[in-house]
């Protein structure tokens, strides 16, 4: 039996404390041996908001997970050209870890979009889906999961009692509006990096 590995894909623009809480919860509650953080160079399903290059986003993730047990950075998406399709990500990781059991972290709000992902019928049955609640995500997740299970043979592992209202969008909005308090939403080393690099219109070196 191979390792139980998690895939945590995203733009991480920027990575925040909510991302870390989500990864820790998935690792601990689902008994994962390791979670691979996979920053997307070019997300296929939504435009990438401005503020940080893929190099900066990779470095922020590296800083955020430094010293975290059972977490590692993967560059399979960052290093390849074109859209970061999930099926391509999974196939590359399967080549690197041929004996692994795969678990994909998915925000609850992504359930409705999952059937529209590139080559969804091939992708969905190939891993288990750890579904993380998101505030205000609307539709009943139980019904959505039941429909996807019937249609694609999906296997879901809900983190039903997880709560976190931090999002990268919220962080960027606070930064754009010049509101104080955004630093508390991010790991300290990521805050320092943003100041050092002058990302998200923060004055460099401030």
Curated annotation (Swiss-Prot):
Can you name this protein? Answer: Probable nicotinate-nucleotide adenylyltransferase
User: Which SUPFAM superfamilies does its entry note?
Assistant: Nucleotidylyl transferase
Family classification: Belongs to the NadD family.
Q: Tell me the organism.
A: Gloeobacter violaceus (strain ATCC 29082 / PCC 7421)
What Gene Ontology biological process does one annotation of this record name? Answer: NAD biosynthetic process
What keywords would UniProt list here? ATP-binding, NAD, Nucleotide-binding, Nucleotidyltransferase, Pyridine nucleotide biosynthesis, Transferase
Q: One short Pfam family name for this protein?
A: CTP_transf_like
- Tell me which positions the record assigns to the signal sequence: none
Which EC class is this protein assigned? Answer: transferase
Q: Which NCBIfam families match?
A: cyt_tran_rel (TIGR00125), nicotinate (nicotinamide) nucleotide adenylyltransferase (TIGR00482), PRK00071.1-3 (NF000840)
Q: Is NAD a UniProt keyword of this protein?
A: yes
Look up the EC number in the record and give it.
Answer: 2.7.7.18
* Metabolic or biological pathway, per its Swiss-Prot or TrEMBL entry: Cofactor biosynthesis; NAD(+) biosynthesis; deamido-NAD(+) from nicotinate D-ribonucleotide: step 1/1
Gene name, Swiss-Prot/TrEMBL: nadD
Q: Which PANTHER family match?
A: NICOTINATE-NUCLEOTIDE ADENYLYLTRANSFERASE-RELATED, PHOSPHOPANTETHEINE ADENYLYLTRANSFERASE
